[in-house]
From Swiss-Prot:
InterPro entries recorded: PAE/NOTUM
The organism's place on the tree of life at top rank: Eukaryota
GO cellular component, one term: extracellular region
Recorded name of the encoding gene: PAE1
Organism encoding this protein: Arabidopsis thaliana (Mouse-ear cress)
Subcellular location: Secreted, Cell wall
Pfam family, one: PAE
Broad class of where this protein is predominantly found: secreted
Upper classification of the organism: Eukaryota, Viridiplantae, Streptophyta, Embryophyta, Tracheophyta
Record's function text: Hydrolyzes acetyl esters in homogalacturonan regions of pectin. In type I primary cell wall, galacturonic acid residues of pectin can be acetylated at the O-2 and O-3 positions. Decreasing the degree of acetylation of pectin gels in vitro alters their physical properties.
UniProtKB keywords: Cell wall, Cell wall biogenesis/degradation, Glycoprotein, Hydrolase, Secreted, Signal
Family: Belongs to the pectinacetylesterase family.
Signal peptide region: 1-24
Protein name per its UniProtKB record: Pectin acetylesterase 1
Length: 388
């Protein structure tokens, strides 16, 4: 099967609704409690047994997830969606994060809306609607990759243990019998899906079809508008604060600085499990937090472009360069037949849990079918065609 490589999908343009918290911590509209009675709301399950394994949130509380059971032909198939929410890059920021659901399960919403990839309606999610669907809550601040602690600051950096403890709990609830499984994630959860992809695959026997998808998790090692590297500074803080040099892939850390191994472009070619990269070439989070954050945009000349997509010609030229750099960073990865790539042209960040981008529901001649079709074609190997 050839790689599904899309160079743009402009009809999926749409501004994602989000609010920026500390250091770009993001909560999308589809994680709210919502008001639409037709939206599937799924309750929170806490993994009490995780405490004995040291698999705890920043504040020491146990981790949690939301599970919607599959049925019919999907009863033995599983989707695991890792929640996003940026990172904490210093002791102070991690302590602040403890005061939210991104650092403590005691403060997590008790229900979340399941939309897009997590929808249980065939009309909204044709390939995966009847699968078992899980959303794993993010409360460690380092993309489920830490395994250390700071006793003096009363901080637990146990993301990797959380991932394994939740997976063990789900195995006991039937995932062990999975015939097909997909590990996915949004934003920093999309980065997690890359980092934990092979670990996830190793949980299953060879007879289980296991693949992974990163949605808006391809954070590029890019130069910002001032000529600096804003995201490098943030990632260096995350890696040093949580000691990720001990947990990031040694195939990467053995030859470049450990914090660079938090950038997907330096590790994706070593992922053995089939992996799908879904990202916007005009990623709204990266534009506002990596390319033109306030620290790099002292004059504020990028504000309208970053947050309202009202960009000048020169700014669009800069952003086109960013998109081309993203495509270039994926060239080698896309040559592996097991992998898939979909780079859209929408002004967005996280598209698999948005119904209007995941599966809009129209497929007439010349009209977009939605991301769901591309992901389904890749996962089930239904097509060999490339699209441009």
């Amino acid at each position: 099967m050839k790689t599904l490589l899309y160079w743009g999908w402009s009809s999926l343009a749409g501004l994602i609704l989000f609010s920026i918290l500390a250091h770009g911590e993001m909560k999308t509209f589809n994680e709210s409690n919502g008001t639409n009675a037709n939206v599937l709301m799924v309750g929170l399950t806490l993994v009490q047994a995780a405490a004995a394994k040291g698999a705890v949130c920043l504040d020491g509380s146990v981790p949690g997830y939301h599970l919607c059971r599959g049925y019919g032909s999907g009863a033995n198939n599983w989707i695991i969606q890792l929640q996003g929410g940026a990172w904490c890059d210093s002791i102070q920021n991690c302590q602040s994060r403890k005061g939210s659901g991104y650092g403590s399960s005691t403060l997590m919403e008790k229900e979340l809306a399941f939309l897009g990839l997590l929808s249980n309606k065939a009309a909204e999610n044709p390939d995966f609607y009847n699968w078992n669907k899980v959303k794993v809550r993010y409360c460690d601040g380092a993309s489920f990759d830490g395994d250390s602690e700071n006793k003096a600051a009363q901080l637990q950096y146990r993301g990797k243990r959380i991932f394994l403890a939740v997976m063990e709990d789900l195995m006991e609830k039937g995932m062990r019998q999975a015939k097909q499984a997909l590990l996915s994630g949004c934003s920093s959860g999309g980065l997690s899906a890359i980092l934990r992809c092979d670990d996830f695959n190793n949980l299953f026997p060879p007879t289980t079809t296991v693949k992974c998808m990163s949605d808006a998790g391809f954070f590029l090692d890019a130069v910002d508008v001032s000529g600096g590297h804003s995201l490098r500074r943030m990632y260096s803080g995350v890696v040093n604060t949580q000691g990720l040099q001990n947990t990031l892939p040694p195939t990467c850390t053995s030859h470049i600085k450990p914090f660079l191994c938090f950038f997907p472009q330096y590790i994706i070619n070593q992922v053995k499990t089939p992996l799908f990269i879904l990202n916007s070439g005009f990623d709204s989070w990266q534009i506002g937090n990596s390319l033109a954050p306030p620290s790099a945009d002292k004059s504020g000349s990028w504000h309208n472009c970053s947050f309202s997509f009202r960009c000048t010609a020169s700014q669009m030229h800069f952003l086109e360069g960013f998109k081309m750099s993203m495509l270039d960073a994926l060239k080698t990865f896309s040559k592996f037949s097991k992998n898939g790539v979909l780079i859209t042209s929408g002004w967005a960040h996280c598209q698999a849990e948005r119904q209007d981008t995941w599966f809009p529901g129209y497929s007439g001649a010349g009209k977009a079918k939605g991301i769901a079709v591309a992901v389904g074609d890749w996962y089930f190997e239904r097509t060999k065609q490339n699209s441009s």
